[in-house]
């Protein structure tokens, strides 16, 4: 980093290239500000009335005029106000600052200069310099927008005010300032980016841009703005302020200079000034001085002399120290340049690079570039203005197009090459001169170092030559003790130096002690205050938390009891009822039994008396009631007797009525007999006279006559008939061809016309088998890689265990393996699980069917880190998950109409969340529509009654229609126009900016189109499915949730009503439906736009290459560094636990069972915070079932190809599959096979036994049923239209499927090769690590002596006696140590002994005697350090002795392996009677056998 050498405005920092660049800026560097165009969608008929706009414009012009007058007076009369920190001219002592502090001081001076200038222009006070550099006062861009509006109000009309917090809309203010920078012509290298200011990435770059902008304005438009004031040395800053600036911006550099003189005297105030709306009205008119012809720059040639002929007299005598030079002695010679041709300084500057990508300086060949000559910068700027300008749709005028005169002529290849060569020469010259200038600046910075280096070189050269030409003869002098004398001299010097330092320090000993005491006291006070503050802060919350916890504990206890009682409530109630019933019954039974025994006869008599009394009272009441109705009863009996008499009288006339019915029946029978007899008689007469034969002859004659007439007519017009037939066939073939190409769901009739083209084409089975073989090999290689990585990590962990116990003498630095080759894999099973959750969306889909709320809450975080955007890889995988949920929603919907009507589906919610998090920048596309809706003049109300009431203030009369009112009618028409204009604005987004739509949205549109086509054969339903994403998801997200993106409405409720109406209208238009109700007049426009809407919906679809790239991601993950996923610890455990809970729902052969077969180890997880998972791609397995379904699907498709050529069915494939086989179908199938011998080689045809059409159809139906059972499709819903669509696509591109599989085979082989190479290198590394670990263990085992201690003669005599007496035990060989049970237990080695109570406390009369241990001795020995023997000796006697002497063994390497993954905590020895702790046992072995010298 270079240091500041003063103000960039000083003359000493000239940059000739940038100076000439500013002076030579052409008049057409940027297009002049012009009123923006009014396109078709911005027509005044569709937006607002002219009177309103005219009033608004005049008001802005008047305010601009007043502002310009105020600015002119301030510029001509006032000088810029200086800051309060100014202490006079060059009165600040800069010697107190260090070198680094001086750089930040100069930087703050530049900030102060910019602050003074802006305050003078906008006449408003700005915050302090430190606040501007470190704070957030500039981030909202309000001051920059005010500066832009002050200089030229046309550049910004609206300034978004500063609020309580930073919002997205504040970027409009910064973009307005970028317009000022663009029109002034600041070079790209001096401009800052939006994120430098908005995200506070590089604030120093912002001030550098401002400094350059001010310099260029003062240079090009002198007198328009105040001059820039140099405050270096005149303003003071405290060291705390400089430290704060340094902390905020650790790296700063000096400002680049344009070489302009900022102190240029302003123009005379007496000059007449034009009336303008700002300080600078036209940026194309500025003062341009004449370019002086400079002298030719002569590069000084370096005087290279020969080393052998050099003159030593020129070398200074003192060679050990370079002479000091002052910076003032360095003469800086002004560079001289050759005159520049005037043609190169024409209207277009040679080095003016537009920030917009331009094709005018294309690297295409001349033959291609000549077709791009009309793509001028004007159209590029115009398109950029349409995309970025938020007020573009509020304008109403177009300005005439300006074409460059040079662009009107088409250049030849020679002219183009000449211009390119000329431009390249100019660029190379400028770059060379700029590099020379930079090198000179670097040399100036390192002048002292270079001078010292040159002096050292000259001295070294002189010494070398002196030794060559002037050899010094030295006599050999042997002085004894020279080294001792030299060391004594050096020692005395060092002691003298240290004594001097001690004496110097002793002078300030009191001060040092006081300083130390003060520091210690300060530290102690700080610590005590911190603890007191912590106690004071946490006391109240802690007591409150404790009370909450106690209350929560009590409530939980009460609730648990209440819950248990509620669970048994019914049983308790039944039990209590039974008890009460038993008590009552017992008391009653006791009373009855007592009474019954004493008064049995009296009770029976009493009962008979009561019954008699009750019966008599009932009879008396009945008799009494009948006595009151005695007269009525007499009358009723008289009526009954009269009715009986009348029935007897009527029965006398019954025979006559029966006779009449019998007569009628007899007459009917007679007439029937006569009619039948007549018909039989007529039939006999007809048969006798051959009437049927006569009729047949007559009909035959008529038919023959008609056929003769037709035959003669055909013979006379045979050519015409053939032509008509050919025309008909041609027309049918053409219509079938167009339907096949254009229609997404062609009919069976159209496909049958061209299905014969697929006869003899190659099948996919062979390449599919090859792909399965490659994928199986890839799976095996992945498993091998997983095993190798596991083994390598185990060896590395063993090496770490050895290092932990200090058994490594020389650490091998070659053991380290880069993270890209071997991931750390701290959480291996979690990394596999979350990789599968990303790659395979079926897991989330199955869990969503069980736990939809859980999936909605947690699925998004498994694809990306919190508060960070997804990468392309994660976006692709997440899009696949949305597709899976989308397909599931379509399959579960009863019909495509019900699916489209449901606006609250899960896939829509997660897609809107994806747009909100990952694509907020696309909100700028919808901003013009929102600005149009926010206009108070725009209204979408279509109800004439409401319009009438809104205009007149009262309801319309009942006797007349509100449309009869002229004002209501005009308002109704204007509202419909406004609504249709908003619809056109949205349609224009999908027409002109279709490529700006996220590719994920377009891919989902493609997939939903295919899913809808498979669900329903109607084309219109597929297009409506596309519109459900474009309108109900994409547009709806940005319109409805506009506040999230920082857009503020003046009337939120009114705009919500407009958006609701607009969304319904957009759905009607894009779903190609008709308006109803009051919006019916819009149908004429909707019908005209329907073909255009269809084209728009089709243009949104993406090519299959995008999906193929997504399929290749899995292979890329296998050979790339492991992708990382950062999640909260609790979320990782929660998600993995949920999948463990539903593990049985997944297929048994699924890889998820292998991952979750054991409980996931979460002991290494941090208790809180985040966990970074390195996802393991080797966990993925290619499913054989999917490949099998693909084969079956292809076989069914080929079977339908053959069946369409056999049977004559034109409805759909479902009818073809279930149709009855006719007798002629079998011969037709045999002839079909004879005519197409290649079809006989089809493996599917060869497997037919017998080879008949019936067998083919039967096998095909079974395969269709198998596909339906797997959920691939539903034949009853779409009538097998998906097969027909696939056949039609195969006719269009017959080799697509085979090419796709072939390409996948190629990628699989490449991946297999790379993984094999990785496995080979891992295998080599594993063997190296194993050898290293074995060699290390053997080395430190050989370095130790494990021979036993020499025994005495008595010991040998004892062994001999034991052998003779037969009391010999198995003795351990080599070095041995023994411990009792207590020692091993206290060391943590011994865990348990079966049947023994270790460390049991026994209480005696006088108190406890401490823990007791069994008298068992353990001896451990080894003879080579590799294998250890352990002996257990039970010293107890009598019944207390439980174990006989036993011996067990273990290897040291096995003991080390227990300390690495998977760790084994304990071992069971001596027939599982003794349990030991492996970690403590290893520590014991190392301490006593390998490090016994350290004990």
Curated annotation (Swiss-Prot):
One of its GO terms (cellular component) is cellular bud neck. It comes from Saccharomyces cerevisiae (strain ATCC 204508 / S288c). It comes from the Eukaryota. Its main location: other. Pfam families: CH, IQ, RasGAP, RasGAP_C. The gene is IQG1. The modification Phosphothreonine is found at residues 264, 299. The calponin homology (CH) domain binds to actin filaments and is required for their recruitment to the bud neck. Interacts with AFR1. Interacts with AKR1. Interacts with activated CDC42. Interacts with calmodulin CMD1. Interacts with myosin MYO1 and its light chain MLC1. Interacts with BUD4. Interacts with INN1. Interacts with SEC3. Interacts with TEM1. Keywords: Actin-binding, Cell cycle, Cell division, Coiled coil, Phosphoprotein, Repeat. CDD domains: CH_IQGAP, RasGAP_IQGAP_related. GO terms for biological process: mitotic actomyosin contractile ring assembly; mitotic actomyosin contractile ring assembly actin filament organization; mitotic cytokinesis; protein localization to cell division site; regulation of actomyosin contractile ring contraction; regulation of cell wall organization or biogenesis; regulation of cytokinesis; regulation of mitotic actomyosin contractile ring contraction. This is Ras GTPase-activating-like protein IQG1. InterPro entries: CH_dom (IPR001715), CH_dom_sf (IPR036872), IQ_motif_EF-hand-BS (IPR000048), RasGAP_C (IPR000593), RasGAP_dom (IPR001936), Rho_GTPase_activation_prot (IPR008936).
């Amino acid at each position: 980093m270079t240091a500041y050498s003063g103000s960039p405005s000083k003359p000493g920092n000239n940059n000739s290239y940038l100076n000439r660049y500013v002076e030579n800026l052409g008049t057409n560097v940027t297009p002049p500000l012009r009123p923006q165009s009014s396109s078709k969608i911005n027509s005044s008929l569709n937006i607002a009335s002219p009177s309103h706009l005219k009033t608004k414009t005049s008001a802005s012009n008047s305010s601009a005029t007043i502002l310009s007058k105020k600015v002119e007076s301030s510029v001509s009369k006032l000088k810029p106000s200086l800051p309060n920190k100014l202490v006079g001219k060059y009165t600040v002592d800069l010697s107190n600052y260090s070198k680094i502090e001086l750089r930040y001081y100069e930087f703050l001076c530049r900030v102060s200069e910019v602050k003074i200038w802006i305050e003078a222009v906008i006449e408003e006070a700005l915050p302090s310099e430190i606040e501007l550099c470190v704070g957030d006062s500039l981030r909202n861009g309000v001051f920059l927008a005010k500066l832009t509006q002050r200089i030229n109000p046309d550049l910004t009309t609206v300034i978004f005010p500063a609020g309580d917090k930073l919002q997205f809309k504040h970027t409009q203010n910064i973009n307005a300032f970028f317009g000022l920078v663009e029109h002034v012509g600041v070079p790209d290298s001096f401009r800052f980016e939006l994120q430098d200011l908005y995200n506070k990435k590089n604030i120093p770059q912002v001030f550098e841009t401002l400094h350059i902008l001010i310099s260029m304005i003062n240079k090009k438009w002198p007198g328009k703005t105040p001059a820039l004031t140099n405050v270096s040395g005149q303003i003071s800053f405290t060291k705390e302020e400089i430290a704060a600036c340094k902390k905020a911006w650790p790296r700063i550099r000096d400002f680049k200079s344009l070489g302009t003189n900022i102190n240029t005297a302003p123009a005379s105030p007496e000059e007449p000034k034009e009336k303008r709306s700002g300080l600078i009205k036209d940026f194309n008119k500025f003062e341009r001085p004449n370019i002086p012809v400079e002298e030719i720059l002569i590069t000084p040639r370096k005087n290279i002399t020969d080393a052998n002929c050099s003159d030593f007299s020129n070398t200074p005598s003192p060679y050990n120290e370079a002479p000091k030079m002052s910076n003032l002695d360095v003469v800086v010679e002004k560079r001289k340049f050759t005159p520049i041709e005037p043609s190169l300084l024409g209207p277009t500057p040679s080095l003016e690079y537009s920030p917009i990508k331009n094709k005018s300086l294309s690297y295409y060949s001349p033959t291609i570039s000549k077709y791009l000559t009309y793509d001028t910068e004007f159209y590029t700027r115009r398109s950029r203005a349409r995309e970025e300008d938020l007020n573009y749709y509020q304008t109403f005028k177009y300005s005439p197009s300006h074409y460059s005169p040079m662009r009107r002529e088409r250049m030849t290849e020679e002219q183009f090459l000449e211009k390119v060569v000329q431009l390249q020469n100019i660029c190379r010259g400028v770059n060379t001169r700029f590099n020379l200038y930079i090198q000179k600046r670097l040399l100036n910075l390192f002048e002292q170092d270079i001078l010292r280096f040159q002096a050292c070189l000259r001295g070294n050269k002189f010494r070398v030559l002196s030794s060559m030409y002037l050899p010094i003869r030295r006599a050999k002098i042997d002085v004894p003790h020279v080294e001792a004398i030299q060391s004594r001299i050096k020692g005395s010097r060092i002691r003298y130096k240290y004594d001097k330092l001690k004496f110097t320090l002793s002078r300030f000993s009191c001060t040092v002690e006081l300083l130390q005491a003060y520091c210690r006291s300060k530290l102690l006070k700080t610590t005590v205050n911190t603890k007191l503050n912590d106690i004071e802060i946490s006391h109240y919350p802690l007591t409150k938390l404790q009370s909450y916890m106690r209350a929560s504990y009590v409530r939980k206890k009460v609730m648990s009891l209440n819950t248990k009682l509620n669970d048994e409530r019914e049983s308790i109630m039944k039990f209590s009822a039974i008890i009460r019933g038993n008590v009552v019954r017992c008391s009653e039974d006791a009373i009855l039994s007592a009474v019954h025994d004493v008064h049995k006869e009296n009770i029976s008599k009493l009962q008979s008396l009561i019954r008699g009394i009750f019966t008599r009272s009932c009879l008396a009441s009945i008799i009494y009631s009948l006595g009151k109705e005695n007269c009525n009863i007499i009358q009723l009996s008289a009526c009954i007797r009269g009715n009986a008499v009348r029935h007897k009288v009527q029965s006398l006339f019954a025979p006559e009525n029966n006779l009449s019915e019998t007569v009628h029946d007899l007459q009917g029978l007679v007439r029937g007999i006569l009619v039948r007899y007549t018909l039989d008689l007529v039939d006999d007469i007809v048969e006798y006279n051959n009437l049927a034969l006569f009729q047949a002859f007559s009909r035959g004659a008529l038919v023959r006559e008609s056929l003769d007439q037709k035959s003669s007519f055909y013979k006379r017009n045979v050519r015409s008939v053939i032509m008509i037939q050919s025309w008909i066939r041609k027309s049918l073939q053409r219509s079938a061809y167009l339907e096949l190409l254009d229609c997404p769901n062609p009919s069976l009739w159209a496909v049958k016309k061209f299905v014969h083209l697929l006869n003899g084409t190659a099948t996919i089975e062979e390449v599919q088998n090859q792909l399965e073989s490659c994928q199986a090999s890839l799976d095996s290689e992945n498993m091998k890689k997983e095993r190798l990585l596991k083994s390598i990590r185990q060896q590395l962990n063993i090496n770490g265990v050895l290092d932990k116990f200090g058994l490594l003498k020389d650490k091998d630095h070659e053991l380290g393996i880069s993270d890209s080759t071997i991931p750390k894999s701290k959480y291996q099973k979690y990394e596999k699980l979350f990789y599968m959750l990303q790659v395979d969306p079926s897991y989330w889909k199955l869990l969503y069917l069980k736990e939809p709320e859980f999936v909605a809450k947690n699925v998004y975080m498994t694809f990306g880190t919190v508060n960070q955007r997804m990468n392309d890889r994660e976006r692709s995988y997440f899009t696949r998950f949305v597709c899976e949920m989308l397909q599931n929603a379509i399959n579960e919907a009863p019909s495509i109409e019900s699916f489209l009507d449901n606006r609250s589906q899960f896939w829509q919610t997660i897609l809107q969340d994806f747009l909100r998090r990952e694509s907020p920048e696309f909100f700028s596309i919808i901003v013009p529509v929102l600005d149009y809706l926010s206009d108070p003049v725009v209204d979408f109300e279509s109800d004439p009654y409401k319009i009438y009431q809104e205009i007149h203030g009262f309801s319309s009369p009942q006797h007349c229609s509100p449309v009869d009112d002229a004002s209501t009618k005009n308002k109704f028409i204007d509202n419909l126009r406004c609504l249709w204009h908003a619809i056109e604005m949205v349609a224009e987004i999908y027409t002109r900016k279709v490529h700006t739509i996220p590719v994920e949205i377009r891919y989902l549109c493609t997939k939903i189109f295919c899913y809808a086509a498979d669900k329903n054969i109607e084309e219109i339903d597929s297009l409506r499915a596309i519109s459900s994403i474009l309108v109900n998801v994409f547009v709806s997200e940005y319109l409805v949730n506009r506040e999230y993106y920082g857009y503020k409405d003046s009337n939120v409720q009114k705009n919500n009503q407009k958006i609701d109406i607009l969304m319904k209208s957009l759905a009607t238009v894009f779903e190609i439906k008709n308006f109803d109700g009051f919006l019916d007049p819009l149908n004429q426009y909707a019908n005209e736009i329907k073909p255009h809407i269809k084209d728009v919906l089709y243009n949104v679809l993406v090519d299959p290459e995008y999906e193929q790239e997504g399929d290749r991601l899995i292979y890329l993950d296998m050979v790339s560094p492991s992708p990382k996923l950062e999640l909260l610890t609790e979320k990782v455990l929660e998600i993995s636990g949920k999948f463990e809970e539903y593990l049985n729902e997944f297929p048994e052969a699924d890889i998820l069972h292998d991952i979750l077969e054991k409980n996931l180890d979460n002991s290494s997880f941090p208790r809180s915070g985040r966990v970074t998972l390195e996802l393991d791609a080797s966990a993925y397995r290619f499913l054989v079932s999917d490949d099998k379904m693909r084969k079956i699907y292809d076989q069914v498709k080929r079977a339908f190809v053959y069946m369409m050529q056999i049977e004559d069915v034109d409805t759909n494939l479902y009818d073809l599959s279930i149709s009855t086989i006719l007798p002629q179908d079998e011969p037709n199938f045999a002839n079909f096979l004879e005519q197409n011998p290649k079809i006989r080689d089809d493996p599917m045809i060869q497997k037919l036994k017998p080879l008949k059409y019936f067998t083919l159809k039967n096998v095909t139906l079974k395969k269709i049923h198998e596909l339906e059972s797997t959920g691939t499709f539903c034949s009853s819903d779409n009538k097998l239209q998906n097969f027909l669509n696939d056949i039609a696509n195969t006719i269009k591109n017959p080799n697509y499927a085979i090419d796709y599989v072939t390409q996948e085979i190629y990628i699989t082989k490449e991946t297999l090769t790379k993984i094999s190479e990785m496995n080979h290198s891992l295998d080599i590394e594993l063997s190296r690590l194993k050898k290293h670990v074995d060699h290390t263990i053997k080395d430190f085992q050989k370095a130790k002596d494990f021979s036993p201690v020499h025994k005495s003669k008595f010991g040998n005599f004892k062994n001999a006696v034991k052998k003779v007496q037969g009391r010999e035990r198995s003795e351990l060989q080599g070095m041995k140590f023994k411990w009792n049970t207590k020692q091993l237990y206290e060391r943590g080695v011994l865990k348990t002994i079966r049947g023994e109570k270790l460390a049991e406390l026994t209480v005696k009369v006088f108190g406890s005697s401490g823990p007791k241990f069994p008298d068992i001795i353990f001896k451990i020995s080894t003879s080579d350090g590799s294998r250890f023997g352990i002996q257990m000796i039970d010293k107890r006697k009598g019944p207390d002795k439980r174990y006989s002497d036993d011996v067990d063994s273990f290897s040291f390497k096995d003991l080390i392996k227990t300390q690495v993954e998977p760790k084994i905590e304990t071992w069971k020895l001596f027939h599982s009677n003794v349990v030991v702790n492996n970690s403590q046992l290893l520590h014991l072995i190392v301490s006593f056998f390998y490090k016994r010298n350290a004990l």
